[in-house]
């Protein structure tokens, strides 16, 4: 950002008093790195720590940030404030050192709230679809020339980054309910895509607590703000009477204010009509597969319509939507000749979905777009607690594919829970009589295992939120060839 642009920004977003140097503990995460990127472009000195380099840290270094690949007390030297990821424990040496030095220690959402304080904030919350919906809204605003700032939990492909600093008053941000820290946000517009049981440890295992937290989040809106809510979701429908704010509903339901009709999927694109009260219908071509993405797009349309963005910009942004990282991410078609000597090719897709509802939506999108393909899924469960709490749902959803390979659970720092592991899940699915799942004890052998099961016209879906994305990229880089990917 040049001096003139920064001066324009400072006309409505003042500096944070004497804060000059901001340190991030766990800076390599997408959400943390995105905020750091925006602040770096605003002119703040940025430092941070994490355990290993990745794309996020590389981008920040290119912006002038100082990154430490360790956690040591001296890393916070000269910091004005320390921002902490939810993945970082309270006994981290940098946090201890900051508290001893009386340096403020805040959570990621508190810093995001500070970015939003003087801007027109659009916050996207919900159990599923936040990242994609955030990207769609950001793309529409950019298409309309509104130059928004955005902070997303995933890669926005059109921008090549998780976050971007714009010169306008608009800030579009993904709002994370996993630790209830989204309650720090005070947006002008709030989207809630759906509400399901997830991250229940935060809510003491009580679903009513989760619902009440979402209601509180919506009441952070000013009385003149706008809640955009998916009325197809039964939980959202149940809480609407408790939300004392202006509401726009959206969905396939007949009583939705912004309604989807005539949905059809052809390959990776969705075709549908959106009807709006007292406005012309929109015939949408969405460059993203699945009914779930039609819902995400309709949330974006509702927000854009509320802001008065012209239909031509809305339609162009959705037609040209490039997607987000690891959300039905097409990695290529690969010949089987060098994989197992067969003729033909297979399609490789990478997807982040790790909740049964998300996995189900991805499977349905794959079936609808490529009905003639056999679906081969490599699934990595994420967290033992989630596997335990949603065990039967996982068994039911995973039973829909044609070939299933299961890796060990990605623990994300959790201790193993008996009966909530991948081998148990394999046994349960096998007992249902349709599939004979393959347990992958060592992901280093995955290419050889795939070579033994793949045939022409298969769709290989690599699914999960842990390190399985790295496996997907390696499979693509080596074109699924065992001898290359397992050297």
UniProtKB/Swiss-Prot annotation:
- Name the enzyme's class: ligase
Record localization: Cytoplasm
The entry's cellular-component GO terms read: cytoplasm
The reaction(s) catalysed by this protein are: UDP-N-acetyl-alpha-D-muramate + L-alanine + ATP = UDP-N-acetyl-alpha-D-muramoyl-L-alanine + ADP + phosphate + H(+)
Q: Which cysteines are joined by disulfide bonds?
A: none
Which intervals of the chain form a coiled coil? none
Stored InterPro entries: Mur-like_cat_sf, Mur_ligase_C, Mur_ligase_C_dom_sf, Mur_ligase_cen, Mur_ligase_N, MurCDEF_pg_biosynth, UDP-N-AcMur_Ala_ligase_MurC
Q: Which Pfam families match?
A: Mur_ligase (PF01225), Mur_ligase_C (PF02875), Mur_ligase_M (PF08245)
Keyword line: ATP-binding, Cell cycle, Cell division, Cell shape, Cell wall biogenesis/degradation, Cytoplasm, Ligase, Nucleotide-binding, Peptidoglycan synthesis
Chain residues that bind ATP: 126-132
Q: In which pathway does it act?
A: Cell wall biogenesis; peptidoglycan biosynthesis
Query: GO biological process: what's one of them?
Result: peptidoglycan biosynthetic process
Q: Which HAMAP family match?
A: MurC
Q: What does this protein do?
A: Cell wall formation.
Supply the name of the protein: UDP-N-acetylmuramate--L-alanine ligase
Q: Which organism is it from?
A: Proteus mirabilis (strain HI4320)
């Amino acid at each position: 950002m040049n001096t003139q642009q920064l001066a324009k920004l400072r006309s409505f977003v003042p500096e944070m008093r004497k804060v000059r140097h901001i340190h991030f503990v766990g800076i390599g995460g997408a959400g943390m790195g995105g905020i750091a990127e925006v602040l770096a472009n605003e002119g703040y000195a940025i430092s941070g720590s994490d355990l290993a380099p990745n794309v996020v840290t590389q981008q920040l270094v290119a912006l002038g940030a100082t990154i430490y690949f360790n956690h040591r007390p001296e890393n916070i030297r000269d910091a004005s404030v320390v921002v902490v990821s939810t993945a970082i424990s309270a006994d981290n040496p940098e946090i201890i050192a900051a508290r001893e030095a009386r340096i403020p220690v805040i959570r990621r959402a508190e810093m995001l709230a500070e970015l939003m304080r003087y801007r027109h904030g659009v916050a996207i919350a919900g159990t599923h679809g936040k990242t994609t919906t955030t990207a769609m809204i950001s793309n529409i605003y950019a298409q309309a020339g509104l130059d928004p700032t955005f902070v997303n939990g995933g890669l926005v492909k059109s921008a090549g980054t998780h976050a971007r600093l714009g010169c306008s008053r608009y800030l579009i941000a993904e709002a994370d309910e996993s630790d209830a820290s989204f309650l720090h946000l005070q947006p002008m517009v709030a989207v809630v895509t759906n509400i399901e049981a997830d991250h229940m440890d935060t809510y003491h295992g009580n679903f009513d607590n989760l619902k009440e937290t979402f209601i509180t989040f919506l009441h952070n809106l000013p009385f003149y703000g706008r809640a955009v809510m998916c009325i197809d979701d039964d939980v959202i429908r149940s809480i609407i009477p408790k939300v004392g704010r202006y509401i726009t509903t959206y969905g396939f339901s007949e009583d939705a204010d912004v309604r989807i009709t005539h949905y059809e999927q052809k390959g990776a694109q969705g075709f549908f009509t959106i009807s709006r009260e007292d406005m012309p219908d929109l015939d949408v071509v969405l460059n993203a597969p699945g009914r779930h993405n039609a819902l995400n797009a309709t949330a974006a349309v509702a927000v854009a319509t509320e802001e008065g963005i012209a239909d031509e910009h809305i339609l162009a942004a959705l037609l040209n939507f490039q997607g987000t990282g690891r959300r039905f991410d097409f990695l290529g078609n690969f010949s089987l000749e060098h994989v197992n000597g067969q003729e033909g090719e297979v399609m490789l897709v990478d997807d982040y979905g790790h909740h049964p509802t998300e996995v189900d939506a991805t499977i349905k999108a794959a079936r609808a777009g490529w009905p003639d393909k056999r679906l081969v899924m490599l699934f990595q469960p994420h967290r033992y607690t989630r596997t335990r709490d949603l065990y039967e749902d996982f068994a039911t959803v995973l039973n829909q594919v044609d070939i299933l390979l299961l890796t060990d659970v990605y623990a994300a720092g959790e201790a193993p829970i008996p009966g909530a592991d991948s081998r148990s899940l394999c046994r349960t699915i096998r007992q249902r009589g349709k599939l004979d799942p393959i347990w992958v004890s060592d992901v280093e052998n995955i290419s050889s295992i795939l070579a033994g099961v793949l045939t022409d016209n298969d769709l290989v879906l690599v699914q999960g939120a842990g390190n399985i994305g790295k496996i997907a990229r390696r499979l693509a880089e080596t074109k699924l060839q065992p001898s290359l990917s397992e050297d």
